[in-house]
């Protein structure tokens, strides 16, 4: 098995973890119903960009 030769420093650990942060989902308000939904996704009642797309 692979075993590290030397211990990694706190700085190297932090550099590795610098890309691990989670981002919040981008939310927007629907033009028709005023409902909050994720960007580029259909609302729960079937509207997308102000138009009914799911009957």
Swiss-Prot record:
SUPFAM superfamilies: Zn-binding ribosomal proteins. GO terms for molecular function: structural constituent of ribosome. One of its GO terms (cellular component) is large ribosomal subunit. The keyword Transcription does not apply. Keywords: Ribonucleoprotein, Ribosomal protein. The keyword Repeat does not apply. It comes from the Bacteria. It holds the Pfam family Ribosomal_L32p. GO terms for biological process: translation. Belongs to the bacterial ribosomal protein bL32 family. This is Large ribosomal subunit protein bL32.
